[in-house]
Amino acid sequence: MSPKNPVSNFISADEEMLAFLSNLGQKWCVSDGVAEFIERNFTFVGSKPVLQILKDYKTSDYKNFADIKNFLSSNPSTQSKILSGEISYVGDNLTGAGVKIASEYFYDFLKFTVENIPEHRYFCSPETGWILLVAMEGYVEFAVLD
């Protein structure tokens, strides 16, 4: 009997994320330019965008996905902006691929990323200018470009 090689079973975070989206359906695609949109349009301090100075800024601490969902659903105008069209996503560490998803996938995809991929998550809409940062340190921020 040969010993198992644990590395041969390894899949990258990108592969895991894309497989998850494939299981949801076909209303998504890999999307270049998500990180560039964020870098061009937001001011950064260190590795994170400064959102506190922007319109409609809201923040909350979270311990799990349910806390994030409660934060968003308790702010109907925020939730409405997020769910009003296609949503772009990029992580800042383990995932290299940006993706664009249908809004109907948002909560399932958010839950998957929070529970499975340890990185800061950026959801945004280049078309309408909103951004949602879900930080690994346990806080979430939402803001809209002026």
What are these regions (language model features)?
Residues M1-D146:
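Structured alpha/beta or helical-core interaction and ligand-binding surfaces enriched in interleaved
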